[in-house]
Amino acid sequence: YINEMGNKCYFSDENANSRMQLYTLDKLGDDWSEPLALKGISDGISEANYPFMMTDGTTFYFAAKGEESIGGYDIFVTRADTENGQFLKPENIGMPFNSEANDYMYVIDELSNIGYFVTDRRQPAGKVCVYMFIPPTSRHIYNSDAYTDEQLRGFADISRIANTWGKGTERKLALERLKAIGKSSTAKQSKSTLNFIINDRVTYTDISQFQA
């Protein structure tokens, strides 16, 4: 993951024990610094991968296998302590984003207020599924007595996506936002696209290539 400024990179790589670990790079001028292992997130974590940093520069999501994992890879969240350059102890974000399967990535597009997470639950070997969701603004505690055990298991495992839609109003608005962003991106791309053939070997693709 590279931040919007293009000067900070988070990535995973094998450490000396052949386990995946998270590292960071800083861009200095035109060059990247030497990789440094992230500090503070290794306690109770055996492997870490698929990092994502929110635009606040402190809220950090990643997938990991560890003592608090439900099964396989789970999504964890931590926050950067800018004073000492370390991260706080990671927390498992829980169900329904985590399951007994591998849950690999959690990303939020703050512009559209739409999130995405990747999992291999109920997928053929070697395949994953990307879910879209509306990021919650707060955690709601539901009365478990109002639901059967089967319903609760279904909610936790997202066995039926339609059960998460409620009245469907927020879902409809989110899809409209996504559609509007897609149209805007297409319009910008088509407006900036230029293919002007100069000769058999030269094609201009930008107006700045023309000189008086």
Give short role names for the model-derived ranges.
Residues 1-211:
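Short, conserved micro-motifs composed of acidic
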